[in-house]
């Protein structure tokens, strides 16, 4: 199975859940403007998932003459859209927000919410998004009833990206392997990971990266995990009131200490019955973040885009 990041996975779901005729009638480019040449006959849509400050798109958006090149801009969160609006004054009448979503034929949900004394945690994001904080916290936790499995690698973006970038994170991988309460699992493909989330109680994700949405956080909450994370970027929008939030600070040692304290507090929470709250959390994401639901948003949107383009012609 080819490695794939969130953008590639969501594009595959779009093609799975949305009418192919509607997709073929437009041209959708993901994140990086003009990485696919503009189509002179179809409506051109930029599905923007990257942050406004990324070097592969900032100069393009900074030049306002470019803004008319796309018929529509689709953003993955309101947080992301409003950043582009404020930074670049993108045309508001040609922007919309359609969230990322979950393929529930792949995601397996937790069903066992029995109170427990031992908790299993996972870290399932790229190494630069907060792995160093998670490992520093685990280094300070001496409780044998708290363990962390680390699924993190640059391989998610393919062999070329890994060959160019993985070496800088080798010390983190080695540290994960050396800690007695941490298991370094390496790369795990998305489909397999969707079957594993149910086996963990907590997603330990002390994000130090401004997420424009955070698919892994959404999937963890939807599976029925408790999420420990920061309030950075679009995380509060994606995760609502469900996580245990740590106020973000760029003081990494302090953030690690706060995370360790939160982990021990969450461990105590599992001594009680959490079933009702976690099942409500599962129901919330099934209601609003199922690709069957989001796919209808896309179909309605594309139908309107196609009609406008046809009338213009």
Segments the model singles out, each with a brief description of its role:
Residues 4-9, 250, 254, 271-306, ...:
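A charged, aromatic-enriched C-terminal amphipathic alpha-helix characteristic of glycosyltransferases
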Residues 26-56, 71-75, 95-99:
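Active-site proximal beta-strand in glycosyltransferases
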Residues 71-85, 90-107:
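Donor nucleotide-sugar binding/catalytic pocket of nucleotide-sugar-dependent glycosyltransferases
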Residues 113-130, 135-138, 149:
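Conserved donor-binding/catalytic core segment of Leloir-type glycosyltransferases
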Residues 162-191:
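Nucleotide-activated donor-binding/catalytic signature segment of Leloir-type glycosyltransferases, i.e.
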Residues 194, 217-222, 236-237:
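Short alpha-helical segment that forms part of, or immediately flanks, the ligand-binding pocket
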Residues 226-229:
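Short hydrophobic beta-strand element within catalytic cores of glycosyltransferases
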